[in-house]
Every structure is written in C-alpha cells, then in structure tokens.
C-alpha cells in the first residue's frame, strides 16, 4: 500500500452489501422487539461504521441497482434471468438502509437503466483521473477487477469473521495471471459467470480461459486467430465464439 493520499474515496456496492448482511444471519436472523427482521440493516451498518472508523474516507457514496432494465438486458434477455426475486424480509429493510445513509449524509446513487456497477465504474474512473485520490470499491464483485489501477482498489468485505481484503493491481495480476486489469472481463467472457447467467464457452473453465487470454491477450484477438488453435479447443472456440462477445 502507498502512503495515505489526501483524498480517500470509498464507493459502496450497496445492494450487494445488503444481500450479504441479510444472508449472513439467515439461519439466525436479528429481529427487533416487534419480531421484524433487521439483519440486513444491522450488518450493513456494521460494515459501514467499520469503514468510517478504520479507513477514514474523505469521500463516500453508496450505489444501488434499480428495477428498470438495462442495456445489458436488452442486448441479452437472459442476463441475470436465473436470479430469484429479492426476499421479502430484505425488501422490507431497504427503506431503513436508505434512511440510515440519508441520516449519515452519505449520497445514494441509483439511476434507471444503469446497474450499481456502472455507477461505481463511472465514479472510479473519474477519481482515477483526478490528482490526489485513492479509490476503494467496496464489493465482492469480481467484474469490478477490470477497474483496478495504481490508485483504485477492490475492498472485499471479510467472510465469517475474517478481516477484509484489499486487491491491488499486483495482486489482481497474480490471481488472474494477466498483464492488464481489463483482461478480467475477457477471462469471465470465456469461462462464463453463473451469477450473471453468462454461459461462456462450453467446456472452458477458469484454467483454460486464463491460458487462452494469456496467449492471445483478448477475446477479440483470440477469435481472429483461431487458426493457431488445435483439436477440440479450436472447434469449441470457432463454433461458440459468439457466446463470448
């Protein structure tokens, strides 16, 4: 980690944090005196207060999805179609989470037609080009790895009592075996992403996807050079390449 910058921006993946908090207490939910489930509010507040106390951000915002379809849904109707609707007990807590953020004067950013990831990415890119900022994207979403740079990091909340993990550019490259952060999405395109209902190429898992991107650099270059592949792998890429674009 570098010395503390003059400006530290923390961008919360709000909906993901709410889901995470809700299911962390799923088997033993926290309820108030009226029997109302408040697990998500409690867990969300704990994470937020921990960040404020220990990370001391100078700037902070919380990004959320909306129910409106995005360009991704229009381009690929099956996008996230495998996801179940929000649990009612979590849905009931969302207004309380918004009230908590409003009471703490933390901006709530949500725009119809855009996912929280889009807003997080926009903020991260703006801050990345602004002198004096270090940006921390608070999320478990591996898609956000493509935004990591020398001044932008993925701040992953801890699991089961473990401390959080900060993914910097060096760690990202080591984990994925890549040279550039944007190659994360190329690997995910090939191997698929079940959380977003992205199928990927049949028979191509993480190991093969890493090898292909390591050799060709991008999905686009891979599809332009299938003559360099052999056997079953060549057949799979040539017959199913459109599934990765």
Language model features: what each stretch is:
Residues 3-6, 56-61, 129, 149-153, ...:
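Non-catalytic nucleic-acid-binding/docking modules located in mid-to-C-terminal regions
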Residues 2-138, 142-170, 243-245:
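Noncatalytic, basic helical substrate-engagement surface that gates or grips nucleic-acid strands
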């Amino acid at each position: 980690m570098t010395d503390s910058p003059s400006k530290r921006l923390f961008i919360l993946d709000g909906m993901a944090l709410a889901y995470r908090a809700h299911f962390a207490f799923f088997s033993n939910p926290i309820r108030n005196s009226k029997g109302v489930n408040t697990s998500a509010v409690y867990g969300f507040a704990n994470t937020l207060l921990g960040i404020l106390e220990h990370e001391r951000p100078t700037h902070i915002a919380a990004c959320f999805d909306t129910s409106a379809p995005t360009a991704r849904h229009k381009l690929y109707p099956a996008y996230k179609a495998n996801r179940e609707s929000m649990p009612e007990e979590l849905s009931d807590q969302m207004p309380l989470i918004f009230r908590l953020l409003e009471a703490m004067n933390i901006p709530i950013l949500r725009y119809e037609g855009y996912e929280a990831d889009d807003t997080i990415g926009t903020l991260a890119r703006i801050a990345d080009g602004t002198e004096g900022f270090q940006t921390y994207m608070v999320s478990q979403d591996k898609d956000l790895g493509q935004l990591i740079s020398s001044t932008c990091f993925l701040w992953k909340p801890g699991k089961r009592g473990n401390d959080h993990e900060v993914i910097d550019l060096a760690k990202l490259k080591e984990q994925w075996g890549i040279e550039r952060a944007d190659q994360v999405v190329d690997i995910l395109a090939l191997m698929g992403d079940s959380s977003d209902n992205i199928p990927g190429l049949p028979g191509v898992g993480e190991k093969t996807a890493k090898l292909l991107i390591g050799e060709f650099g991008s999905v686009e270059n891979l599809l332009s050079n299938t003559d360099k592949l052999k056997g079953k792998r060549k057949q799979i890429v040539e017959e199913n390449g459109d599934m990765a674009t």
